[in-house]
C-alpha cells in the first residue's frame, strides 16, 4: 500500500506502492491512496467532514512519492508551485536506445477505451515533453533517468512505447506476453 513519509496540518506526503491507484476510478473506488488516507485523517468516523485533495497522480503500476493536501487552499497553493517541481523517475525499458539522451515531444490524446496515444494535430491532443538520459545498458535493456517536463496521463509509458522501447512490465503499452513485473 503506502507509507506516510511526512505530515503536517496542511499536507500528507506518502510513498505509494506499485499496484495502488492514486484516486478512484470507475472500476475501483476503495483500494486507492486517496481512500486510505481519507479514512486515516477522519480516524474511521463517517461523520467527519475532513477532506483530502490529490495534488498530483502516479499511474497505478508506478511507485513513488505522492503529495495530498488537507484543504482546498493548500491544494491550490501547491498547484501554483507545482510547475516549479522537478519530476524525475527511473525506469527500465526494452532495448538499447541509439540516442543516449534527448527530449521526446508529442501531443497526447485519449480514446474511448482510455488508451493514450500521440497525435500530430496540436488541436486534438495536449503537449507532452519527456526528457531522458540513459544511465546504464545491458544486453536487452536500458536503465533511464526520466524527467517530465509536462505531466500527462501515461506520458512516460506512451512516449517510450512509441519510440520502440516500452517499459519493462507494462502490460498496457509494453511487449505482449511479457511476464508481469513492475513499472518505474
Please report, for each region that a protein language model flagged, where it lies by residue.
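RNA pseudouridine synthases
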Residues: 1-117, 123-129, 137
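Pseudouridine synthase
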Residues: 29-37, 71-72, 110, 127, ...
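Thr-Gly-centered strand-to-loop micro-motif
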Residues: 23-24, 118-119, 144, 168-169
